[in-house]
Structure formats: C-alpha cells, structure tokens
Amino acid sequence: MAAEALSENCDIVIECLPPQLFRTVGVSVIDRGKIFMPLSVGQLLEHWDLVERAKKTGARILAPTGALLGLDAVRAAAEGTIHSVTMVTRKPPSGLEGAPYLVEQGISLKGLKAPAKIFDGSAREGARGFPANVNVAAALSLAGIGPDKTRLEIWADPALSRNTHCIEVDADTARFFMAIEGIPSENPRTGRIVPLSVIAALRGLVAEIKVGT
C-alpha cells in the first residue's frame, strides 16, 4: 500500500518516516480529516501550513511526548507567562553522526575524546539541522513558547551510553528543572521509550479516565 493511501483505510496514522516523505503522508491524512500522529515533530515546524489545513478539514494533529518528560507542566505554565525555556541534549557521538548540520559545518565526531558542544541556537534551527535527533526539542517548543524562543544546546559526549535531556523552565507560576536519561533503541538516534509513548497516547484516546493535562 502506498504511504499516501493509508488515510483511506485508517482513522489514525502514526508517522515515523524519513523527512522527505513527511509532507506526502501528512497532507493525505489531514485532507481526509483523520488523526495524524507525527513522531518527526521537527518536520511539523517545517510544514506548519498542515496545521492550517487541519483547521479547515477537522483533522487532528497529535504530537506524542516521545523521549521527553514534563510536557504537562510546560503546557500548564504556558497558560500563564513563560519567561524562558532551555534544553540541553547530550548524546553519544554515534547518535549524532550524519546530521545535516554536522555535514554542512564540516564537523566530524570521529575520535572524540571529551564532551563537545556542537550546537547552540533555537529549537527551530536545531530541528532543521538534526532532523533525526531532536524532535523532542520541537515538541517542547510547541508545548511552551514556540520554536524560535526555545533555546537548545546539543552536546556529543563519548562517555555517555544514554541520550540525556535536561530542561529548565522559568515562568510566572513556577521555575522547574527536568532531566531524563533515555536508553537508546537499536537506532541510536532515538530511545526505547518513544514507541511506548505512542502506545500511551493511543490508549489515552479511548481510556475511560485521562490522567494529566
């Protein structure tokens, strides 16, 4: 079955595709008014017109928490005023190799002996430069103050065996810090908890009781 034909036979389509296929599937699902659950949340930032299309067709776009934590607290804080959101991601070099940003900048991680900061910028810029690595930053930005105001640092650390994300949020209602150490899956660019997050999101659609925001 062609990817774009999935929406003809499904009520919910979960996307976990290479970036170049994101729009094809997204348009098909949204134009039919179905539920679109993208794991490549960073690609949603690049194709924001899909959100406008969803408003017209009645489709829903559900971004799962993925490898993050605390999005409920960020969303709640966003109902007031969030002053700043900063995320620091640290990954083993193998989980970052081949990222477009590294290729464009001519940065090699081979033989890295000590932690190295390889990116410092906005969540939007990070999602564009590391499309397979920091979809979590895109999700965080959508829950909070947006992709241009959310700050992101990415570090390559050869001493790590887990993908780590540390988040600091400063708001008028609270200041909080969150950290998670995710066990990588067979694909070192993502974590084992990501598919479980999708399952939890699907259960939430039909559960008798909903826990969390």
Where in the sequence are the language-model features?
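Short loop/edge segments at beta-strand edges and connector loops
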Residues: 1-2, 63-65, 154
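Rossmann-fold dehydrogenase core element
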Residues: 49-68, 83-87
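Gly/Ser/Thr-rich loops at beta-strand to alpha-helix junctions
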Residues: 42-45, 65-71
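Active-site-lining helix/loop region of Rossmann-like oxidoreductase modules
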Residues: 67-213
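General beta-strand structural signal in soluble alpha/beta enzymes
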Residues: 15, 38-39, 61-65
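Rossmann-fold NAD(P)-binding glycine/threonine-rich loop
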Residues: 20-28, 32, 39-60
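N-terminal glycine-/serine-/threonine-rich beta1-alpha1-beta2 phosphate-ribose binding loop
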Residues: 1-28, 171
